[in-house]
């Protein structure tokens, strides 16, 4: 069989990875080095050359989008869809496993996935029920604590509190939360992985079945795995499974959410003899950008080591701009984008990256003032929007009456006269009798223990849920969804919310009906009812794609959101000490290297043009703050960077010049471009001027000292 098509389009190192013998393998894949292509071709190689059945292959990705792309590309390469292969995220595959073995995992058949918002809502209720002060014991912190323990594989009884009263309280919250979830048949995202891991540990025959089946395991973005994910893969592989991991220790930027870059080294230790192949040829960026990225990341210690290169052009130098303040910075970026557009470039080819979401406000205002469309990447996702979650909660309750989180969300949405006092009685009964909220309502209504008006409203609500579930059981999913939206008053409620916001909510509900109409079963969903399958899809998918793409628009996003993306022109703003690297990383040991990896990720997003900006002053939290330029700027090779020198007045509050008029010489006798010497900073060049008389100020770019603003009357500069 001719398999040259699997190798012909690859470079030497990519071929080596694709055609490697079936053994444990680490592919250290640099940014833009074609790792997805290598994974896809490797899977095709295993089936075509090694005669491996698709049934024996599990491929793990970190996003549903990446999983869908991998399935599509494998199908294109092989010419047919490959049934039996498991391709998905850790959470998606764990969910599939638990559905198949729900009884062995001690879960009801109709268990539901609890997303982070509903998890928070449940924890608020539990903390209140435990008579804990929400200010002292914040529900969001409880959620972080519980998820962190699960990521480490720990149940409440595993945690050693060592007499620490704070730890003991969190342990009790975790225990109460676990019991509430078990009663209602709810599983949060961290629970999916932990429960799947426990299933294999507690049921050796099930583990053995999957070990014998999945003899070829491939994992993408391995540097982003946490402890439970690593343990999951390690357990599945056993002593006979062949594991290929693809990762880049230089792009490990999720330590704050449990990712362990050390897992790559653990893999090499746990799988002795594993081969390492480095993909260093970059197909994205110019040579200048790659030289800067290499120099930057070399300042980190303990790297596995690789150096990106390209046989493409050197490209333009990296532009560096020192802004007077954040307003100047934003206007500079917008003007550069306008120039790009005037020269025939698309707005969507331009991305503005920032360390913190709070930085976007000024940028958004500048873009609005310039009438320049923009899109915030990673904004509110479709399935996370209020109106969508309301409709989904009704559907969840129809699918499973014991879903407490769904019950809490919709029992009085729209308002139907069921107040907090009534619900508190229901909640207390639920706790006292170890019942779900639905079961507690049933018993209280039978006992006539609730006030008349509230009891009637609750009775009508429950009867409507039961009736609609029965009436729509055999209807198509989209008809069922449309009935829920109309019969429960959601559409009417949002029609009463006047203006664009209400209209947007209605349009989103209509889009949900469209989504249910277009929903198609995956192989792993074939044993589920349509409603259960769609609810699982909605919880796992959570709309990973960005906003509508019909309009050409500038892309705004955090540096974390930018990972995996690429743009012809990239701006990284706020390159200042305390901003990027963040103050937290400077205050906490061990965090600085992850910040540098984040800078590396930002730099390697750029294909053709990269611009870095920093501001001398920045208004933060209502105060004017002075920052030094980021140390990351100083770590870039001088030959790769070019400082931008603009006309004198841009956004200086003390300027007497008309905005935009260039000041070539002022009454202090200095000129733009003049070489000068300062007693402390040495030699430099005047790159900007503002004001006149005693207010005259000069911006001087000093060799090795950066750019400084000086008052001309006191600077005592000597002409060189």
Where do the PLM segments sit?
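Conserved helicase NTPase motor core
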Residues: 8-19, 23-28, 38, 58-59, ...
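Conserved helicase C-terminal RecA-like lobe
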Residues: 159, 163, 346, 360-372, ...
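ATP-hydrolysis module of ASCE/P-loop NTPase motor domains
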Residues: 21, 82-85, 102-191, 214, ...
């Amino acid at each position: 069989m001719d398999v040259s098509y699997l190798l012909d389009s690859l470079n030497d190192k990519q071929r080596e990875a694709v055609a490697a013998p079936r053994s444990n393998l680490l592919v250290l894949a640099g940014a833009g080095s074609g790792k997805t292509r290598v994974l896809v071709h490797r899977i095709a190689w295993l089936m075509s050359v090694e005669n491996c059945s698709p049934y024996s292959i599990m491929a793990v990705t970190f996003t549903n989008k990446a999983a869908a792309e991998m399935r599509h590309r494998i199908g294109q390469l092989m010419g047919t869809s490959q049934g039996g292969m498991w391709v998905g995220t850790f959470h998606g595959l764990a969910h599939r496993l638990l559905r198949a073995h729900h009884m062995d995992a001690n879960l009801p058949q109709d268990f539901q996935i609890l997303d982070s918002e509903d998890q928070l809502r449940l924890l608020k209720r539990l903390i209140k029920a435990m008579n804990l002060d929400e200010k002292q014991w914040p529900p969001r912190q409880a959620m972080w604590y519980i998820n962190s323990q699960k990521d480490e594989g720990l149940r409440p009884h595993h945690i050693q509190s060592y007499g620490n009263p704070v730890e003991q309280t969190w342990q009790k919250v975790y225990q109460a939360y676990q019991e509430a979830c078990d009663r209602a048949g709810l599983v949060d995202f961290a629970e999916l992985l932990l429960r799947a891991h426990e299933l294999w540990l507690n049921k050796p025959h099930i583990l053995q079945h999957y070990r014998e089946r999945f003899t070829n395991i491939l994992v993408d973005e391995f540097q982003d795995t946490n402890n439970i994910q690593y343990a999951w893969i390690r357990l599945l592989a056993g002593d006979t499974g062949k594991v290929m991991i693809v990762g880049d220790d230089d792009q490990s930027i999720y330590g704050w959410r449990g990712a362990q870059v050390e897992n790559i080294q653990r893999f090499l230790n746990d799988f002795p003899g594993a081969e390492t192949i480095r993909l260093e040829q970059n197909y994205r960026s110019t040579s200048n950008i790659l030289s800067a990225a290499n120099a930057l990341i070399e300042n980190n210690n303990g790297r596995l080591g690789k150096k990106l290169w390209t046989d493409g052009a050197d490209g333009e130098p990296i532009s560096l701009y020192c802004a007077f303040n954040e307003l100047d910075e934003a206007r500079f970026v917008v003007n550069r984008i306008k120039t790009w557009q005037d020269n025939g470039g698309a707005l969507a080819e331009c991305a503005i990256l920032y360390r913190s979401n709070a930085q976007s406000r000024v940028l958004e205002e500048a873009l609005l003032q310039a009438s320049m469309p923009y899109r915030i990447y990673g904004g509110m996702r479709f399935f996370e929007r209020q109106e969508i979650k309301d409709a989904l909660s009704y559907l969840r309750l129809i699918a499973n009456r014991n879903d407490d989180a769904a019950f809490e969300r919709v029992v009085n949405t729209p308002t139907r006269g069921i107040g907090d006092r009534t619900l508190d009685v229901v909640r207390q009964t639920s706790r006292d009798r170890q019942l779900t909220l639905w079961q507690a309502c049933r018993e209280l209504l039978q006992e006539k223990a609730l006030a008349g008006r509230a009891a009637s409203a609750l009775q009508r609500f429950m009867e409507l849920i039961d009736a609609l579930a029965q009436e729509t059981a055999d209807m198509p999913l989209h008809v069922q969804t449309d009935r829920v939206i109309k019969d429960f008053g959601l559409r009417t409620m949002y029609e009463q919310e006047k203006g664009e916001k209400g209209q947007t909510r209605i349009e989103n509900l209509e889009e949900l009906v469209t989504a249910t109409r277009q929903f198609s079963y995956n192989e792993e969903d074939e044993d589920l009812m349509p409603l259960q399958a769609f609810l699982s899809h909605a919880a796992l998918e959570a709309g990973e794609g960005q906003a509508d793409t019909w309009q050409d628009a500038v892309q705004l996003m955090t540096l974390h959101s930018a990972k995996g993306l690429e743009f012809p022109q990239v701006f990284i703003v706020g390159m200042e000490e305390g901003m990027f690297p963040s103050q937290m990383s400077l205050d906490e040991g061990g965090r600085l290297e992850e910040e540098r990896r984040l800078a590396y990720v930002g730099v390697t997003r750029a294909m053709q043009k990269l611009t870095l900006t920093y501001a001398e002053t920045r208004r933060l939290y209502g105060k004017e703050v002075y920052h030094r330029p980021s140390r990351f700027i100083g770590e870039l090779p001088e030959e790769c960077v070019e400082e931008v020198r603009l006309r004198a007045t841009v956004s200086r509050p003390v300027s007497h010049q008309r905005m935009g008029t260039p000041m070539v010489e002022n009454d202090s006798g200095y000129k733009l471009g003049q070489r000068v010497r300062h007693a402390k900073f040495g030699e430099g060049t005047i790159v900007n001027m503002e004001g006149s008389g005693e207010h005259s100020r000069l911006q001087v770019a000093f060799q090795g000292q950066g750019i400084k603003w000086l008052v001309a009357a006191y600077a005592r500069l000597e002409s060189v």
